[in-house]
Every structure is written in structure tokens, then in C-alpha cells.
């Protein structure tokens, strides 16, 4: 019976049925085609491009040359995300897509500083996103929260302006802080004081780290600074056994995103990709989309990739990584327990 179940997990219809948690999803990289067109219309931008031409600008090629080519895709959508109305709609759209993918809990991250070209304040940008999340929660069977993201290449004075948001917006949907960007030229150690000030406020922290070759020190620095989760963390594979053991003991969660990790050239071949190796060691790995539109993916497709790459990765393994994600989610213990119970029940039903 067990073998039969493990073969079932390879089928896309079984994967579609699985309840899922997603911790690492960027708002601006995850808009649907229909909503990109609606956002353009709202912004008074007359798009003469065909759907194929829009996708060519919004999606990175499967074989992206480098990280820069991948990041250029964000330049296309950012001008559309400069008003309260459009940010609210964008947030709603991403949660709607997630709900259709049977995601029951999602955290969506975005950099408020990227959305101020039409005179929104940082506070208004965050409130717009939260409004979209709340509206989607009312319409779909999903819980959604927001993370504020700082960009490492921005001046520290600008990044410090994000801190008061956690005092001004006491909304339960604003649950954490992240930093993304060029970790090679802006290593984690440059932001020790900033993260210290965030942690003093009692804010949950996840940090992008360990995406580039020889960037594993950023992972250790992130943990030392108080991050309970690491965005991507591919170079965890290069850490010593003692360092990896420390991550297991601290229950540090890795937010991995297979499609994106290959497109950004964090790895270039499957043998280098450490998802299964780290999972087998007991490290708390999770699966995420990173950017639904830019990577032309959804969470079910990421699960299908893992099933294809590691045929022995069973239904119970997928259940386990979702429990890891629940444990790492920036929510209260009571809500975590509810999700744990629900997922245990639903995965049991799928396996029968």
C-alpha cells in the first residue's frame, strides 16, 4: 500500500489537492496576466501589446542568462503599482491565485519604498496591500499576511524609515520584516543595527541569504542577528556539520523556490541543488514560488518538480515540509495548532 501511495504523489491531480503553506512570495513578481492588464488600464496606460508580448516582458526565460536578466522583469510591472487602488488589487490577485492553488496560509512580501512614485506614503502603501489581503480572505478559504521588505542597496537612512511602520500599523496582517537584494556587495553584517532595532520592536524577521556562491556567511550572520527564517539559503549546503546542526536545533526554516533558484543561477544543475540533501539531514526546508509571474509557476508546479527530481519524496514528506512551514509562519501558536490539525486531517484523507 505504501508504494502505491508514493506513486500517487507524482500525479498532478493529487498535488493539486494537497493543502499548502507558502512563506516566500513577492507581490510585484506574482501578478496574473489579466490583472496586469487591469492595473495598466487603472493607471491610464494604454497597452497595445498582445498577451504574448506582455508575458515576454513580465516573465523571465527558463534559461535566464543571469540574475540581472531575471530582475529586469520587475521593471515592467512596478510603474503599475503606484496607487492605493492598484496595490490593493494586486494583493487581492496574488491571494486569489494562491487560494486556487489550495494554499491555506500565505505570506506576501513587498518593498513599500518601490511604490511611492505617485505620492503614496509608506504607510498608505502597506495599508493598501493589507486591504487587498483582507478582501481576499473574505472571498476565499485562505489566511494571508504581509511582510515589509527592505532593499539592501538602499541607503540605511531610507531603510530606517520602514521601522515606524510597525508602530503606525498595528494590524494583525503585518507580521514581519525581510531584506532582499544584492547580498554579495551588501552583506548582512552591514545591517546589524537595523535588524537589532527591528527585533527590539518584537518584529519577526526573515532575511534573504545564501543565494550566491560563497555567500554562506550571510546565512550564519542572519541567524546571529535574530532571523528565524532564511530566504532561499541554498549555500546552507556549504556549512559545516556543526553549523547545520545548530540550524536544526534552532528550527531555522529555509524558504526554497526551485524554479527561481535555477533561473537566478543560485544553482545551475540538479546535482548542486540541496533541497533533498538538507531535508534528509533534518533541516526545515519549505517550498515556495518566489515570483509566480516572473518564474511562470505556482506552488503545485514546484511540488511537481520536486516529485520528478526525487521520486521517493512521498506524500508524507510533502506533509512534513508543510508542517515545517506552519511552525515557521509568523502567526500565533493557536493559529499554528489549527493549521497543523487541519493539514494532518486533510493529508490523511488524501492518503486513504
Swiss-Prot record:
Annotated Gene Ontology cellular component terms: cytosol
GO BP, sorted A to Z: adenosine catabolic process; hypoxanthine salvage; inosine biosynthetic process; nucleotide metabolic process; purine ribonucleoside monophosphate biosynthetic process
Reactions performed catalytically: adenosine + H2O + H(+) = inosine + NH4(+); 2'-deoxyadenosine + H2O + H(+) = 2'-deoxyinosine + NH4(+)
Listed Pfam families: A_deaminase
Annotated organism of origin: Lactococcus lactis subsp. lactis (strain IL1403)
Protein name: Adenosine deaminase
Chain's role: Catalyzes the hydrolytic deamination of adenosine and 2-deoxyadenosine.
Annotated residues for binding of Zn(2+): 24, 26, 208, 290
CDD domains the record matches: ADA
Cofactor: Zn(2+)
Active site: 211 (proton donor)
Free-text remark on how the cofactor is bound: Binds 1 zinc ion per subunit.
Binding site for substrate: 26, 28, 181
An annotated Gene Ontology molecular function: adenosine deaminase activity
Keywords, sorted A to Z: Hydrolase, Metal-binding, Nucleotide metabolism, Zinc
Superkingdom of origin organism: Bacteria
